[in-house]
Design a protein with these regions (language model features):
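A residue-level signal for conserved active-site and pocket-lining positions in enzyme catalytic cores
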Residues: 6, 48, 58, 101, ...
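Long, highly charged, low-complexity intrinsically disordered interaction regions
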Residues: 115-177, 340
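Compact, charge-rich alpha-helical regulatory domains located at protein termini
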Residues: 18, 64, 149-231
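Acidic, metal-coordinating catalytic segment for phosphate/diphosphate chemistry
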Residues: 308-417
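Residues that scaffold, gate, or flank divalent-cation-dependent active/transport sites
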Residues: 1-100, 104
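DNA-contacting surface of Y-family translesion DNA polymerases
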Residues: 188, 193-335
């Protein structure tokens, strides 16, 4: 059996762990530049607030004290995610982390009282981390995702829904909107709706040739999994093959010297994430672009890839490569709205050397381990390369909560009276 452990309203739940006074209050979390809403509590959803809605449309609710708002705090969310995944792994070690708030798991088919196992795991995760989760078990990944949605929607499941026979599967398919099926989405869902397919059950009634002609192999995989036949299995290697850090800016930037510290910051984040997975990369790509939605303005977008001779996770090398790429593609007289850095061609574990390498890699590794230790104790911004400067000036985060779990200067103080 496959399973899904899905955190409920994850970003909001992370904020509520440290603000229990907001447990039953409407709460939203904003995107990087406080531009739009990327997470909502159930109470906020009930107010009609939609995902992706521009913040300015609901700002009056904040002013009227009817809505609580937080800027995205990804350092906090990433750390809370690791805590949740650690608890899940302690009970179900065969797992594939799918996203920051969701993981697939596998359990033996002969596990007794599977729903009880899921309910107990749900309680344990919330007790140990403060994060509520919904769990679904079924023969395939697609059905497990469906089961987790039912567990989230209906309180009677007590946090876990199990689809383990054809009767349950057929009932679930008949109740599940086609656009909500994993692998279908809104675009294909609308296309299917025009052909009379409203639910997952309607889609399963199509014959295989029809599905293949309309949607190709991905459609066949979804169609087959909805029948309870697994096609997607766990990918146990959780190391990423590429790592990207990017951001849109609140105000466009036209000056190269102002872009440099921002790109350096993205490159440093890539280096930190590489070291977390014990990886090293040779390819560093930097990209910049203007705002495509302002068609009246001059448009320009470009990227540059810099290849290093030896794979590295040294932030100094990665920042240097990213800045060389930036200087190659930067053009004056354009208003740049977004930039980012991607590292790829990642190797994990032992890094092959080069006869002509001019860097003392042993000495370098000692330095990087010292930096890792400092960052772990004092936060990811405790030590920086000078060029990073104050790159955060390009981000607008007016409502950011403290880094409760990753920065010693921001942990909660408890006073005993």
């Amino acid at each position: 059996m496959m399973g899904v452990v899905d955190c409920n309203n994850f970003y909001v739940s992370c904020e509520r762990v440290f603000r229990p006074d907001l447990r039953r209050e409407p709460v939203v979390v904003l995107s990087n530049n406080d531009g739009c809403i990327i997470a909502r509590s159930n109470e906020a959803k009930a107010m009609g607030i939609t995902m992706g809605q521009p913040f300015f449309q609901v700002r009056h609710l904040v002013d009227q004290h009817k809505l609580h708002v937080f800027s995205a705090n990804f350092a906090l969310y990433g750390d809370m995610s690791r805590r949740v995944m650690s608890v899940v792994r302690s009970e179900l070690p065969e797992m594939e982390i799918y996203s920051i708030d969701e993981t697939f798991v596998r359990v033996d088919d002969d596990v007794p009282r599977l729903q009880e196992v899921g309910i107990n795991l749900s309680k344990k995760v919330e007790r140990w981390t403060g994060i509520p989760v919904s769990i679904g078990f079924a023969p395939s990944k697609t059905l497990a995702k469906m089961a987790s949605k039912f567990a989230k929607k209906y309180a009677g499941y007590k946090g876990c829904c199990v689809i383990d026979n054809d009767e349950k599967r057929e009932k679930a398919l008949s109740l599940f909107p086609i656009q909500d099926v994993w692998g279908i989405g809104r675009r294909y869902g609308n296309r299917l709706a025009c052909r009379g397919v409203k639910t997952a059950a309607d889609f399963v009634r199509w014959d295989e040739k029809h599905v293949r002609s309309e949607f190709g192999l991905p459609g066949i995989v979804t169609w087959t999994e909805l029948k309870g036949i697994p096609c997607e299995y766990l990918e146990m290697d959780v190391n990423r093959k590429t790592i990207t850090n990017s951001r849109s800016f609140k105000n466009a930037i036209s000056d190269l010297e102002e872009l440099k510290p921002i790109v350096a910051d993205f490159a440093a984040l890539c280096a930190q994430q590489l070291r977390k997975q014990h990886g090293a990369a040779t390819d560093i790509c930097v990209f910049i672009r203007t705002n495509p939605h302002q068609e009246e303005q001059p448009q320009y977008a470009n990227s540059a890839n810099v290849r290093l001779d030896v794979p590295t996770s040294d932030l100094r090398e990665i920042i240097g490569a990213a800045l060389r790429g930036l200087e190659c593609i930067f053009r004056p007289n354009y208003a740049y709205k977004k930039a980012g850095v991607t590292v790829s061609n990642i190797v994990n574990g032992c890094v092959p050397g080069s006869l002509f390498d001019s860097i003392d890699r042993d000495k370098q590794e000692k330095l990087l381990k010292s930096l890792d230790s400092i960052h772990q104790k004092m936060g990811k911004d405790a030590v920086k390369v000078a060029i990073q400067g104050e790159s955060k000036r390009a981000a607008n985060r007016q409502y950011t909560s403290p880094a409760y779990t990753t920065n010693l200067n921001e942990i909660i103080e408890v006073k005993i009276l």
